[in-house]
Amino acid sequence: MSENKVLSDLEIAHNATMLPVEAIAERAGINVDALELYGPYKAKINTAKLVLPRGKAPGKVVLVSAMSPTPAGEGKSTTTVGLADSLARAGHKVMIALREPSLGPILGMKGGATGGGYSQVLPMDDINLHFTGDFHAITSANNALMALVDNHIFQGNQLGIDPRRMTFKRVLDMNDRALREVVIGLGGPMQGVPRQDGFDITVASEIMAVFCLATDLDDLRERLGRITFGYTYDRTPVTVSDLGVEGALTMLLKDAIKPNLVQTIAGTPALVHGGPFANIAHGCNSLIATSTAMQLADIVVTEAGFGADLGAEKYMDIKARIAEVAPSAVVVVATIRALKMQGGVPKEKLNEPNVEAVAAGVENLKRHVGNVAKFGISPVVSINKFGSDTPEELEWLLAWCAAEGVEAAVADVWGRGGGGDGGDELAAKVAAALEAPSNFHHLYPLELGVEDKIRTIVQEIYGADGVEFSVPALKRLAEIEKNGWSGLPVCMAKTQYSFTDDASRLGAPKGFRVHVRELIPKTGAGFIVALTGAVMTMPGLPKEPAAMRMDVDADGNPTGLF
């Protein structure tokens, strides 16, 4: 092998020496009898058996977000891992809280989702492929519910469920556009009641959201019972508790709800648990994992999906309303290539030097930084370094941040790792930010109506002139008001590539309106989803899926997971 060969993420992961998970638990302060082992390097934590340190103040949360991304992503997970490793290297007691990867994007576009280079969580292939079975359990609970609903309709429909007004779909942890719209119950009177149906991807399921927002097993059961899956013929909402199956669904999730403990390459403890997308769901790991990490560590580094307009806004306005997990510091990840794309450079030319394009695209970063400040937090910009970045481009961006009064650091945590010195400057700036006074607040009060909440988000965060509602969305607004759901927060479903609902409009557009085509009350999770533009809750695969490059070697080890 050439000394100059750049190793892939998978090769780096396979070359790493992992510690037994019991050693990672000891490092985190987790008593061994709270562990439920899944082999030598993975464990679930039974939080009921966790012996917590007396008198310890809750750890401070660092939320990692980003500017609007390129299709390959800008390295939030890599930065999260590298930053945590660097903080640990500086002597802080740190834990990571991350989402679990979804199989659809792994086989589709991303190829893996556990960080990259020398800033990864391990065992990388296990986490990317099935892990501890949490997504299987969530998928099973979701589809069990729909099987029970359709069976109830077939067996006489005592609740009077209207098959034309179902609001809940079956799910699959895969990108499969062919399943977006289907018809079920065909084949005669013994095969069920025919109706139009469809599939969502598992990470868009309300059960995934409930799973990630529940505070404990009892809260999980209560939230599952509150899920509205459809309406009766007289348009009365029907819930899981009406059907009487919340106990069965809780049973299917009783082990999955326990957080998963793994490690970084540098040996930092990491809780990887839950995984809703941020463009079509709320985009944060489980609340149980975040809260557990805060009880054990002094600093918890977590991330929220896609740009600060999506995951970070939802962390602040949805997750941080349920428990005391508000961030004390926020990191906005920026890359030279993303700035170039936002400045109008085509994908195939992103690796070419172009300071002018960086300058043209920086308005996108500026809006994201300003948006974080609207929650009362001054962010730190982490410039995730790529090999194609030139000194001139990096110097220009650092100078721009300085002129804007924004703390910034170049982080080479992919190439040098956070366990090395690749994230030391970033860690120092984040540690300083954690000591600064925080004035965190939500973007809007819950007393505001749903229409006004949406208008606030699109105007304050996206920079839109206003919002337009389709006729079906306006009808659903009236239903939301009638059923007493107006006090719920809003979860916007929007393309991740633009502040608008049009993925092709890059930069920091002005003079546009956001189009809300549908509103979906998620009464178990406790928010209203607003579908905008053409965003899909069941994605499709690209023309050349990453799966085409994947295989196993003669020893059964995966290859091609980037």
UniProtKB/Swiss-Prot annotation:
The pathway it acts in is:
One-carbon metabolism; tetrahydrofolate interconversion
**InterPro entries from the entry?**
Formate_THF_ligase, Formate_THF_ligase_CS, P-loop_NTPase
Q: Which domain of life is it from?
A: Bacteria
User: A Pfam family name for this chain?
Assistant: FTHFS
Q: Where does ATP bind?
A: T70, P71, A72, G73, E74, G75, K76, S77
Annotated Gene Ontology MF terms?
Answer: ATP binding; formate-tetrahydrofolate ligase activity
User: What SUPFAM superfamilies would the database entry show?
Assistant: P-loop containing nucleoside triphosphate hydrolases
- Name a single GO biological process: tetrahydrofolate interconversion
* Keyword Nuclease among record annotations: no
This enzyme's EC code(s): 6.3.4.3
Q: Which reaction does it catalyse?
A: (6S)-5,6,7,8-tetrahydrofolate + formate + ATP = (6R)-10-formyltetrahydrofolate + ADP + phosphate
Disulfide-bonded cysteines: none
Keywords from the named record:
ATP-binding, Ligase, Nucleotide-binding, One-carbon metabolism
**Which EC class, in a word?**
ligase
Tell me which family the UniProt entry assigns to this protein: Belongs to the formate--tetrahydrofolate ligase family.
Q: What is this protein called?
A: Formate--tetrahydrofolate ligase
